[in-house]
Swiss-Prot record:
Source species of the chain: Leuconostoc mesenteroides subsp. mesenteroides (strain ATCC 8293 / DSM 20343 / BCRC 11652 / CCM 1803 / JCM 6124 / NCDO 523 / NBRC 100496 / NCIMB 8023 / NCTC 12954 / NRRL B-1118 / 37Y)
Transmembrane segments: none
Residue ranges, annotated region (Disordered): 212-277
Gene designation per UniProt: rplB
Presence of keyword Metal-binding: no
GO cellular component, one term: large ribosomal subunit
InterPro entries membership: NA-bd_OB-fold, Rib_uL2_dom2, Ribosomal_uL2, Ribosomal_uL2_bac/org-type, Ribosomal_uL2_C, Ribosomal_uL2_CS, Ribosomal_uL2_dom3, Ribosomal_uL2_RNA-bd_dom
A GO term for molecular function: structural constituent of ribosome
One example of a Gene Ontology biological process annotation: cytoplasmic translation
Highest taxon of source: Bacteria
Protein name (Swiss-Prot/TrEMBL): Large ribosomal subunit protein uL2
Cited function: One of the primary rRNA binding proteins. Required for association of the 30S and 50S subunits to form the 70S ribosome, for tRNA binding and peptide bond formation. It has been suggested to have peptidyltransferase activity; this is somewhat controversial. Makes several contacts with the 16S rRNA in the 70S ribosome.
Length: 277
């Protein structure tokens, strides 16, 4: 994928960039792998806003992606690389020997016509899914399970990957994109290679309207609100926060305060935190 820029015919176009979608080989999705996606406007069943700065956006159909990769000993052929509006990565349409179709995350280098497999005996090549115990040290992986059979949860966005560093009993030591090193059960599965479409992070959206198409609403600073709307609000002109620490709209400390539960069960699997030197 390459990044495409535009002539500055307007203020919104001046710095705008887009993907050239050169890797996309099919523009219409597989109907049997679509599901309805209803928008909530960031409101819950009571009608109350539960997430700020989210609402609207272009209508989308959800693509059913296979994150589990449990169809062992069956070879699948890559029929197409498709765009998925629900994620930053592209997806690959697979057709198995028995005619079953499925979507997977498209790893870097995967092309139409390539063969992919899953299972402990699969080759170590991009797109193949294996238990972590069957993957050599130093290999780049993505779509990593945290619980056996639950499906991949880690390293799924565009350009993401993790690396196997070693083994510790029934666990595999994995370094994630963030720099965090953690233990993952050896029976969990992962897919070989990096997630494709790595240049996605280089896109300049150019204008507010493109973010609205993505379902993002304006993010208003608390310092420009009234004091009844935000702890940072009020004052004459450009006033400071006026408190020992920056606050959330609900009066809780923010901007540096740790939010992870100290008693979270999975903390024991983190060998080194992402911010550790």
């Amino acid at each position: 994928m390459a990044i495409k820029s535009y002539k500055p015919t307007s203020a919104g176009r001046r710095n705008m960039t887009t993907s050239d979608f050169a890797e996309i080989t099919k523009t219409t999705p597989e109907k049997s792998l679509l599901a309805k996606k209803s928008k909530t406007g960031a409101r819950n069943a009571s009608g109350r806003m539960t997430v700020r700065h989210h609402a609207g956006g272009h209508k989308q159909a959800y693509r059913i992606v296979d994150f589990k990769r449990t169809k062992d000993d069956k070879t699948a052929t890559v029929k197409a690389i498709e765009y998925d509006p629900n994620r930053t990565a592209n997806i690959a349409l697979l057709v198995y020997e028995d005619g079953i179709k499925s979507y997977i995350l498209a790893p870097k280098g995967l092309k139409v016509g390539d063969k992919v497999q899953s299972g402990p005996d699969a080759d170590i090549k991009p797109g193949n899914a294996l238990p972590l115990s069957a993957i050599p040290e130093g290999t780049l992986i993505h779509n990593i399970e945290l619980k056996p059979g639950k499906g991949g949860q880690l390293a799924r966005s565009a350009g993401a990957s993790a690396q196997i560093l070693g083994r510790d009993g029934k666990y595999i030591i994995v370094r994630l994109t963030s720099g965090e090193v953690r233990l993952v059960l050896a029976t969990n599965r992962a897919t070989i290679g990096e997630v494709g479409n790595a240049e996605h992070s280089l896109i300049n959206w150019g204008k507010a309207g493109r973010n609205r198409w993505r379902g993002k609403r304006p993010h208003v600073r608390g310092s420009v609100m009234n004091p009844n709307d935000h702890p940072h609000g009020g004052g004459e002109g450009k006033a400071p926060v006026g408190r020992p620490s920056p606050m959330s709209p609900w009066g809780k400390k923010t901007a540096g305060k740790k939010t992870r539960d100290k008693k979270k069960a999975s903390t024991k699997f983190i060998v080194r935190g992402r911010k550790s030197k």
